[in-house]
Amino acid sequence: MTAPRVPALFTDLYELTMLQAYWAEGMTGPAVFDLFARKLPKRNFLLACGLEQVLDYLEAFAVSGQDIDYLRDLGRFRPDFLERLRALRFTGHVYAMAEGTPLFADEPLLTVEAPMPEAQVVETAVLNLLHYPTLVASKGARVMQAAQGRGVVDFGARRAHGVDAAIACARALYIAGYDGTSNVEAGRRYGIPVVGTVAHSYVQAHASEAESFIRFAAEFPGTTLLVDTYDTLDGVRQVIDLAERLGDRFQVSAVRLDSGDLGALAKAARALLDDAGMPQVHIMASGGLDEHAIAALLADGAPIDGFGVGTTVDVVADRPYLDAAYKLVAYDGRDCGKLSPGKLSLPGRKQVFRRHVDGVAAGDTIARHDEQLPGEPLLNCVMQHGRRLPAGRVDTAGARAHAATQLARLPAALRALEPAEPYPVAISPALQAARQALVAAHPKLETP
């Protein structure tokens, strides 16, 4: 299902002032912009995500009459500019890594090639639409690694930074490997399995915990019951007692622990359930979890079968931003690049080649786009003349499958939570020469 259209005026003011200046100066030649991360945010890799939303935005880009009226009222823009803006559409090409592809610092996640005004005005939205999903998917992949094959579901909608963020987060986490989400709209929009249990309020609203368990299990046989409203282990005992007394009239598939010492409580709950002859009842844990908490629980032998993970992942609490940039790398056939210290760009349109040894990623090379080097080219043309190509029509399920395959091909050390030796990313001799030429054109600069 198509997401709501991103407004054309979701842009920074200076994109529009530059656009007026470009048109006034006749600067409408072909431009190439790269979107990339300058460094990894306490991660061994990033996981590309958000491309579908970028392509939706570019295909639908149009400035409405109401938009023009608002801009006119600002008193900043010339009438002829506003009329030209009214007719503006995106007609360029887009090259991108497929969603679910691991990537590393300085590698273009996406390249836009279009007339300068078109390529410039979309900067804000393109960065926004790729930044957060990539950040979340990268965090989610770490959670899945920590879970060691156990199920993980997204519980973070209520504390995500806005409605749109919650929906984008659910999609990104599903691509990263989560099994589902509690967010019903995300499930409807992207075909993600929706899951849910019951809240403490439901238990509290009944005369007793036992009554709430009976009523809910009768309404939803095979459900998961939340057992920590009053006393976690007493709640587990209530489940056991009701199962013994009511038999098939009380069908429960799991109990959920949401507070306290989850490791100790899980061990005690497992012992109670097993002693009662209920090994088939699973234990699910939630409450302030992230990859580190999950790894610690499992390292301690906690018999937890699945996890509900919310706040700390949805807001990416340990690294809530990505040092992403959208930079001009070529204009009108001329290489360009930012040359300030610490932010030296790689000029020109590029390709990234990934080499594998025995099925495991062994190193990447960032090259000029027309080079032919060993390895798998990662940047594919996903949009041409403003229209999506087959490579840009991969749905959420397809992106999830691609992520699973690509993550499995990373070296084990990169998939671990601990910092690993940096993955080798080389720059081809031809691209190095292009960068040297760019620096040489500014003699006060030195190559780092």
Predicted regions and their residues:
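Ordered alpha/beta subdomains of enzyme catalytic regions
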Residues: 1-219, 251, 326-448
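Glycine-rich phosphate/ribose-binding loops and adjacent secondary-structure elements
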Residues: 201-361
